[in-house]
Amino acid sequence: MERNKLARQIIDTCLEMTRLGLNQGTAGNVSVRYQDGMLITPTGIPYEKLTESHIVFIDGNGKHEEGKLPSSEWRFHMAAYQSRPDANAVVHNHAVHCTAVSILNRPIPAIHYMIAAAGGNSIPCAPYATFGTRELSEHVALALKNRKATLLQHHGLIACEVNLEKALWLAHEVEVLAQLYLTTLAITDPVPVLSDEEIAVVLEKFKTYGLRIEE
């Protein structure tokens, strides 16, 4: 797909992320795999003011085009693509319930079968590191090895998928799961969970059932 169309999709995803209540202000960032690198949102520009010309290209060596500044979190986007060859889009936000669970430094367990949408029986919580650092990108790469989404301790959420629509859908789904988890934790701890065997059945069914969006 041509660059301007991808840039427009990135902007639309940012605006939809805000509309869904997953983000606010200039927090969060969105990227898509492009050529040997990626296109990513810039730093410090409110989503409603973004234009296609603001979107930044970063090559496979981590060098961004002149005259533009990418999101400070570009390193963990790059790490996500390196860790997940199947991913073509990454969404990061500071959704309230996901961030609350990340403050507890807990993974989201198999409280609901939709946990399998992230690729396993839980959604991990990557250890804290300062935003924008190589250390954080290393934590992200490890957490995403076997999952499509991870919480970031004291920070937020990352979701990656084959395209932007699926990545945003997954981010929204994880926020709902985080809300369910916190609601259940208010009643009992530990919370009841589905077994690994039950999640394995769901994972198998998800191979032929799920969000149908053109790649």
UniProtKB/Swiss-Prot annotation:
Substrate binds at G28, N29, T43, G44, S71, S72. The active site is at E73 (proton donor/acceptor). Involved in the degradation of L-fucose and D-arabinose. Catalyzes the reversible cleavage of L-fuculose 1-phosphate (Fuc1P) to yield dihydroxyacetone phosphate (DHAP) and L-lactaldehyde. Homotetramer. It catalyses: L-fuculose 1-phosphate = (S)-lactaldehyde + dihydroxyacetone phosphate. Zn(2+) binds at E73, H92, H94, H155. One of its GO terms (cellular component) is cytosol. One of its GO terms (biological process) is arabinose catabolic process. It is an enzyme of class 4 (lyase). Pathway: Carbohydrate degradation; L-fucose degradation; L-lactaldehyde and glycerone phosphate from L-fucose: step 3/3. Binds 1 zinc ion per subunit. This is L-fuculose phosphate aldolase. It comes from Escherichia coli O157:H7.
